[in-house]
């Protein structure tokens, strides 16, 4: 006669015990994060490396040299470098992290001076958008910073000038700066001088790019001439 052995109830429950609170090991998540960081495009990693942890330390020169070498060696990446720098700068302007804004513009100035290839045109468009962002800010320091960068750009002779590029915004903005009414006399003077320098830069750049017909159009002259005469009158009043 067959004999059956009954399995204890406790053992049955134990055999099918399921731990619903099971979670993956943290180290696996960290590994995935590390992989994601490694997959970031090289140009983004090179750009990120030029920014120190403390903006007071200034531009990381060794990493800036690497970024410049990469940009010169791979000019087709210039537009992406410019777009990414513009993204970072816009974010830092909104967050009032002006130390990093200064570093970004210094990097842009160096890249403009180093690169003169056909591929620089898309990069210049990103650069001009960033300059416009600074000029539109209500911070005199950023307005002067943007003007200085634009003047440096105006002194650069591009290998192939862009005939479709227009500077309407900059004519209007620099002309408005010439009429600054800041309550602080020193800041007011600083902004007005920056406006005059900006107008000079626009004229120089349009002449170099053979866009003379554009700059002499009435809609531009109606802003430039009164702005210059206004400041000349102020100088005479002081004298």
Protein language model features and the residues they cover:
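HEAT-repeat alpha-solenoid elements in large eukaryotic scaffold proteins
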Residues: 19-24, 52-68, 81-88, 97-112, ...
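HEAT/armadillo-like alpha-solenoid scaffolds in large eukaryotic assembly and transport factors
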Residues: 28-36, 67-78, 93-97, 115-124, ...
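Charge-rich, solvent-exposed alpha-helical interaction surfaces
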Residues: 42, 46, 84, 173, ...
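Amphipathic alpha-helical repeat scaffolds
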Residues: 48, 90, 109, 131-132
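A broadly conserved amphipathic alpha-helix scaffold signal in soluble, globular proteins
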Residues: 151, 175, 200, 226-229, ...
């Amino acid at each position: 006669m067959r004999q059956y052995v009954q399995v204890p109830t406790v053992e049955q429950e134990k055999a099918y015990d399921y731990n619903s609170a099971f979670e993956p090991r943290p180290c696996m998540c960290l590994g995935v994060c590390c992989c994601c960081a490694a997959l970031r495009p090289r140009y983004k990693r090179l750009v990120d490396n030029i920014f120190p942890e403390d903006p007071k330390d200034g531009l990381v020169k060794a990493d800036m040299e690497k970024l410049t070498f990469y940009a010169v060696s791979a000019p087709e990446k210039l537009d992406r470098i410019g777009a990414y720098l513009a993204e970072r700068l816009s974010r830092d302007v909104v967050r009032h992290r002006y130390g990093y804004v200064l570093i970004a513009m210094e990097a842009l100035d160096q890249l403009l001076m180093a690169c003169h290839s056909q591929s620089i045109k898309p990069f210049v468009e990103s650069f001009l958008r960033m300059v416009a962002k600074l000029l539109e800010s209500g911070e005199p320091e950023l307005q002067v910073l943007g003007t200085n960068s634009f003047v440096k750009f105006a002194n650069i002779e591009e290998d192939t000038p862009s005939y479709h590029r227009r500077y309407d915004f900059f004519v209007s903005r620099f002309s408005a700066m010439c009429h600054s009414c800041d309550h602080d006399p020193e800041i007011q003077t600083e902004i007005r001088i920056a406006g005059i320098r900006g107008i000079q830069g626009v004229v120089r750049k349009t002449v170099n790019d053979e866009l003379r017909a554009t700059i002499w159009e009435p809609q531009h002259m109606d802003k430039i001439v009164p702005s210059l005469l206004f400041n000349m009158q102020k100088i005479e009043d002081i004298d």
